[in-house]
């Protein structure tokens, strides 16, 4: 690939692997900004449950693509793709080094690999009908019309199941038949972050979330946007809702959130290895290894 193309650095890794802290150190060293590639941190007022970079961290290093929309207005992959590519191109025009950080593989690859994403807006009436059917029935429907998608979507992932059905019913085409468009003209270095003690890190982060106030944050979101806000069905918020409804205890919520997050992290790592194949960083000295790899790439 031509060295005349704009350079773009990417840091990917599963949830709770420490991407935020490492990314800030890397951004400080290379005097650049961070483009946040996360499917939930794009929403305002969802700070604790998404482990969003703190206000102090955001003051230290400028973050793009955080708090860009209210949770009541979902941003699909197609919309995020356009917003993110515009932001990155703006950085390139200013001769800055775009630095993309995140754990949402689909969102990341839609930006860097040029995935075609159908521009299908939310179909509220259809969604209500599908939600009334329940996840098992929706899963069976998806298996009939788009069996390949059921191999990529977790059985318990209600949001992605409904989205796949939504795309099929609106376009008549399975979501799994999406094709890759021409990728952006960027020279990309992908770095991967993983941890040997990831399960312990996930447990600790989950405990921190509940002690920091995810239940109160969930209650605030419910009071502002309603109990049926779709994003509150995602990991952490769903369990906090159950506590608020007296259907669960905090200890059980922590246990279930931890289990679901570990399962999610496993799927993330599988995605990264199959779809991205990054240069994995040495856990013994992450920052030093990242700097060496980036400087070698840029030289």
UniProtKB/Swiss-Prot annotation:
Query: At which positions is substrate bound?
Result: 15-20
Swiss-Prot/TrEMBL site (Interaction with substrate tRNA) positions: 104
Q: Which reaction does it catalyse?
A: adenosine(37) in tRNA + dimethylallyl diphosphate = N(6)-dimethylallyladenosine(37) in tRNA + diphosphate
Enumerate the UniProt keywords alphabetically: ATP-binding, Magnesium, Nucleotide-binding, Transferase, tRNA processing
Question: Which GO MF terms does the UniProt record name?
Answer: ATP binding; tRNA dimethylallyltransferase activity
Give the enzyme's EC designation: 2.5.1.75
A Pfam family cross-referenced in the UniProt record is: IPPT
Transmembrane feature ranges: none
Renumbered residue ranges of the record's region Interaction with substrate tRNA: 38-41
- Please give the superkingdom of this protein's source: Bacteria
> Which cofactors does the annotated protein need, by name?
Mg(2+)
Family, similarity comment: Belongs to the IPP transferase family.
Q: How does it assemble?
A: Monomer.
The protein's name in its UniProt record: tRNA dimethylallyltransferase
């Amino acid at each position: 690939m031509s060295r005349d193309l704009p350079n773009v650095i990417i840091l990917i890794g599963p949830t709770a692997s420490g991407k935020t802290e490492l990314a800030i150190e890397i951004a400080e060293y290379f005097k650049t900004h961070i483009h946040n590639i996360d499917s939930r941190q794009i929403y305002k007022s969802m700070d604790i449950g998404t482990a969003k970079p703190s206000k102090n961290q955001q003051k230290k290093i400028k973050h793009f693509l955080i708090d860009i929309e209210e949770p009541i207005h979902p941003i699909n992959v197609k919309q995020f793709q356009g917003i993110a590519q515009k932001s990155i191109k703006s950085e390139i025009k200013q001769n800055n080094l775009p630095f993309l950080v995140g754990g949402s593989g689909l969102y990341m690859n839609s930006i860097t690999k040029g995935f075609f994403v159908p521009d299908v807006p939310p179909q509220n009436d259809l969604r209500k009908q599908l939600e009334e059917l329940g996840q098992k029935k929706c899963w069976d429907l998806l298996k009939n019309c788009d069996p390949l998608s059921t191999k990529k979507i977790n059985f318990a992932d209600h949001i992605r199941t409904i989205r796949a059905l939504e795309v099929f019913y609106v376009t008549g085409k399975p979501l799994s038949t999406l094709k890759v468009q021409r990728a952006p003209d960027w020279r990309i270095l992908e770095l991967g972050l993983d941890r040997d003690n990831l399960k312990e890190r996930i447990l600790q982060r989950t405990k921190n979330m509940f002690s920091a106030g995810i239940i109160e944050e969930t209650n605030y979101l419910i009071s502002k946007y309603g109990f049926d806000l779709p994003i509150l069905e995602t990991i952490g918020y769903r369990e906090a809702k159950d506590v608020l409804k007296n259907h669960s205890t905090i200890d059980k919520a922590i246990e279930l959130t931890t289990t679901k997050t570990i399962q999610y992290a496993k799927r993330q790592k599988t995605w990264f290895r199959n779809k991205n194949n990054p240069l994995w960083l040495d856990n013994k000295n992450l920052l030093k290894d990242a700097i060496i790899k980036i400087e070698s790439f840029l030289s």
